[in-house]
Amino acid sequence: MRPSMATILCMKWGTKYGPEYVNRLHSMVRRHLTIPHRFVCLTDNRTGLNEDIETFSIPSLELPAGAPERGWTKLVSFSPALTAPGGPELKGDILFLDIDIVIVGSMNSFFEQPGDFLIIRDWQKGDYTGNSSVYRWRAGTYPDVLEYFRANLEAVRQRHRNEQEFLTAHLSAQGKVSYWPETWCRSFKRHCVKYFPFSLWQTPEIPDAAKIVVFHGLPNPPDALVGRSGKWYRRVLPTPWIAENWK
């Protein structure tokens, strides 16, 4: 059994996602996580967020002027600013959640599963790469992730496409990476939507034993709900169970 101190951490920046994504994530967590916990959102705009959500500014990546931050921002989840006095002062186990996921089962086991650093094993790659929609670590560990990234920015950008590739490569080299059980976190596109031609008449379903459905790329939950796939070549029928869970 893991220690009782638990934190859900999420991030919202820019204009791609509105405050309703964070508010709905907060509501889903309250329904599905029964152990004592904090819900913390790092954001550049608190407008529209529920008052009972703890909000803090996003720590700076501290990149050189002109260097693009897109694709790397989540690395600040390892910033010492998140555990230092005057900030969120995070303690214990931290579970990072992307704000565009849909929770469909109990979350308690994400804090009970043993491991130093746990992440989804990416569904498309056959190597160590993780999908960082859901990952857990202990507050204050792995400050070297951000330190190494800042000190070796160009080399990291040339070698890795985004933060999840770099993150899992860096921690795999230390032997710290474990993966969630395969059935817990499923891809909407790969595991819920039926293969063509069955997708033309069969509604996407929640996979057996799934706890979280991940919406990576397109469609997002509100689009999938009404049957908009976001891609001309991918047919997605309206998916009622999203409305039942994404609230």
Give the label of every model feature segment.
Residues H26-R30:
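Surface-exposed amphipathic alpha-helices with a cationic face
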Residues I94:
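Short aromatic/hydrophobic "clamp" motif used to bind/position activated sugar donors
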Residues D44-L90:
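Active-site-proximal specificity loops/subdomain of glycosyltransferases
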Residues S133-T141:
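Short glycine- and hydrophobic/aromatic-rich loop-to-beta-strand nucleating segment
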Residues M1-R24, I35, C41, L49-I58, ...:
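A glycosyltransferase accessory/donor-loop signature
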Residues L97:
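Catalytic metal- and UDP-sugar-binding loop of GT-A-like glycosyltransferases, i.e.
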Residues I101-G130:
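Conserved donor-nucleotide/metal-binding helix-loop-beta segment in metal-dependent transferases, i.e.
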